[in-house]
């Protein structure tokens, strides 16, 4: 009620209520709209700006893009056709990176010509395009090469350091002669007389047991130094062929005892200097000595003469 005795009522306002409803509906509609991710919004804005002319495209952009496109197609074609390396070789060689000097070291048995051929050096090979890993894989396939290190020394030099395998002996298998390592691995066929001083191992499995057997002879150098060939018998035991033709037949087991007996017989009886064809040490309870054919004939002649002399003596008595 105001001062004049009138009642005052609050006006609710239907228009105000309707306005609030409209604002709420607008907010709800805005929430229901799909919002693009941030990266897509950038592309959309760029497209709109490009279409409306707000972004200026520089002159010759189309030409440059076309050239780049065709260049990419050309590179892709070279890659598919395998011509990329050829182009690289030609380009870098013309720029002054052609290989002109190859320094090979560590090659006692491997010729430099073999190295050059496997590297494919023809005077126009590019140092930049030279594939070190591929070159190494080729060189380690050479029979004497155990390992190899290859370095590029710019602008025109390649350094090749070889580590070669060491020949331990000669292995005869059938009619073939091969050089072997200490491990028994075959290096290459024997083609040179310069390896004639190496020990000769004969027979199946002789190459794998060679180093271990020779090591057991270390305590008897007077015997080992006279061995011409080590012959493997049935993959179980060894025969020693000495420089004077005597064959020493060793047992499958108790090798040190047999070698000790042989050394004693030679020291006391000079058995290895006599007309002996073979010394059989395979049995532990006896040693058999086989005479040479000439010695056997002489012995038989002596026996016959002694027999006749005894018979004659009996008649006289």
Curated annotation (Swiss-Prot):
GO biological processes: cell septum assembly; FtsZ-dependent cytokinesis
Alphabetized Pfam families for the sequence: FtsQ_DivIB_C, POTRA_1
Keywords: Cell cycle, Cell division, Cell inner membrane, Cell membrane, Membrane, Transmembrane, Transmembrane helix
Periplasmic side: 83-317
Coiled coil residues, start to end: none
Official protein name in the record: Cell division protein FtsQ
Residues on Cytoplasmic side: 1-63
TM stretches of this protein: 64-82
Subcellular location: Cell inner membrane
Domain of life: Bacteria
Keyword Hydrolase belongs to the record: no
PROSITE patterns cross-referenced by the UniProt entry: POTRA (PS51779)
UniProt key word Transport: no
Membrane topology term: Single-pass type II membrane protein
Family listed: Belongs to the FtsQ/DivIB family. FtsQ subfamily.
Function: Essential cell division protein.
């Amino acid at each position: 009620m105001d001062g004049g005795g009138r009642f005052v009522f609050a006006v609710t306002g239907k228009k105000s209520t309707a306005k609030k409803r409209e604002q709420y509906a607008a907010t709800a509609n805005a929430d229901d709209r799909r919002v693009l991710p941030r990266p897509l919004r950038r592309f959309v804005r760029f497209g709109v700006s490009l279409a409306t002319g707000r972004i200026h495209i520089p002159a010759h952009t189309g030409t440059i893009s076309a050239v780049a496109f065709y260049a990419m197609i050309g590179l892709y074609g070279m890659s598919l056709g395998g011509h990329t390396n050829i182009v690289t070789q030609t380009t870098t060689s013309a720029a002054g990176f052609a290989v002109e000097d190859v320094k090979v070291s560590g090659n006692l048995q491997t010729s430099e010509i073999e190295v050059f051929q496997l590297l494919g050096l023809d005077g126009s090979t590019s140092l930049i395009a030279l594939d070190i890993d591929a070159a190494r894989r080729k060189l380690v396939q050479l029979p004497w090469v155990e390992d190899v290190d290859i370095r590029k020394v710019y602008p025109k030099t390649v350094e090749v350091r070889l580590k070669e395998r060491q020949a331990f002996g000669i292995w005869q298998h059938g009619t073939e002669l091969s050089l072997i390592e200490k491990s028994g691995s075959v290096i290459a066929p024997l083609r040179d007389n310069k390896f004639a001083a190496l020990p000769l191992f004969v027979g199946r499995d002789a190459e794998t047991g060679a180093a271990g057997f020779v090591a057991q002879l270390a305590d008897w150098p007077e015997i080992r130094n006279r061995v011409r060939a080590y012959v493997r018998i049935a993959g179980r035991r060894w025969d020693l062929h000495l420089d004077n033709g005597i064959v020493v037949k060793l047992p499958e087991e108790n090798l040190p005892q047999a070698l000790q007996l042989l050394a004693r017989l030679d020291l006391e009886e000079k058995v290895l200097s006599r007309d002996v064809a073979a010394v059989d040490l395979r049995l532990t309870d006896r040693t058999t000595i086989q005479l040479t054919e000439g010695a056997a004939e002489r012995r038989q002649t002596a026996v016959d003469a002694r027999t006749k002399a005894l018979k004659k003596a009996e008649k006289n008595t």
